[in-house]
Amino acid sequence: MGFTGRRGKAEIIEAFSKHVSPYKAKFFSMVGIDFVPARREGVWYWDLDGRKLMDCHCNGGVFNLGHRHPEIVKTLVEALDELDIGNHHLISEQRARLAEKLAELMPGDISRTVFGVGGGEAIDFAIKLARGHTGRKKIIYAKGGYHGHTGFALAAGDEKYRKPFEPLAPGFVEVPFGDAEAVEKAVDDDTAAVLFETIPATLGMPLPPEDFYRRVREICDEKGCLMIMDEVQTGLGRTGKMWGIEHYKVVPDVIVTAKGLSGGVYPISATCFKEGLDDFMAENPFIHVSTFGGAELGCVVAEKVLEITSRESFLENVRKTGEALSEILGKLKDEYDFVDEIRQKGLFIGIKMVEEGWGPLLSISCYHSGILAVYANNDTSVMQFLPPLIVGEKEVDYIREKLAGAMEIASQRREMVEFIRKML
């Protein structure tokens, strides 16, 4: 017997509601989604009833390489014959190899890595790094951003995630995203770091002004604070370059990567930084540890992920399919009056509608048309569109047909927007 389909769909949903989250179960019931993933392969998800969806959510980039990529699965299976998670207290060949590969692929002189399990943990360490190195306390971050659900990462996120758990760690100062003047005013002699997502996904993928990060870099240099870039979603080829920040020709002090580094099969994250920023750890090298961070099985998988995503043919495919989707989305924008703007770098895409509530409506419409996509939680006028980076011509043709169908469904159900706004 396999690992899916051991129970019927109704029984699974009931057990999930009772023992995992009645609130998520209720939400999906309210919007008419009863999808329970079973088989998954490449760009596709199948539920227990055989219904097929193209995964254009990718769990925020976890499935950049699609589901169960054959090279990734083969690597993990072979590694299980020899390795386990390892011991984070000891020197590790696998962590050394992965860190070496990351240093090779990082922009500028970023050459050192501390590993974690998820993006929030990696952001937490980036903030520890900034405070430990500079001796300062203040962290500047963007309103509407999202960096994770853990301590420091949560404190640097939007109010809707922080408020139920306050008081949180002090010293965090919010500025509007893309506003260099606001950053300049906020940064002072007690600022340890400025922290941004290169393009904030949860905020709806607004593209920063072209000179924004150049100005942020200058401000950080002038004030002696660190520039931290959260590349959890924009990194690993998603934008057509290895790292999203490369589009803006700036080298930060710290880059955080996670999600896609896992290959979709083994959780791992990395905080990558310039040599010397961890000088505060000289006195106690064990002041920051992570039991499962940089597990040796995960390192082997992540090394294979980097090998695949750094291939020029891979990045060229992202750029090529991104251009094809840009043309398709441009035509849909012209055809449907509720589409306001297409925000795009490579295959990192936000479809901006005319008002809040349209993002969820288009997401539901996509589901009924055969595509899995989600809305931006901090701007519900936007639907995130993140197809796997392995899509080719056949998949683009599928997207053309199904996205047009979803737009038509949304257009015919536009009266639901007000209801959705009240529900959220």
From Swiss-Prot:
Its EC number is 2.6.1.-. Keywords: Aminotransferase, Pyridoxal phosphate, Transferase. Its cofactor is pyridoxal 5'-phosphate. InterPro entries: Aminotrans_3, Aminotrans_3_PPA_site, Class-III_PLP-dep_AT, PyrdxlP-dep_Trfase, PyrdxlP-dep_Trfase_major, PyrdxlP-dep_Trfase_small. It holds the Pfam family Aminotran_3. The modification N6-(pyridoxal phosphate)lysine is found at K259. It comes from the Archaea. It is an enzyme of class 2 (transferase). Belongs to the class-III pyridoxal-phosphate-dependent aminotransferase family. This is Uncharacterized aminotransferase AF_1815. It comes from Archaeoglobus fulgidus (strain ATCC 49558 / DSM 4304 / JCM 9628 / NBRC 100126 / VC-16). The lineage of its organism: Archaea, Methanobacteriati, Methanobacteriota, Archaeoglobi, Archaeoglobales.
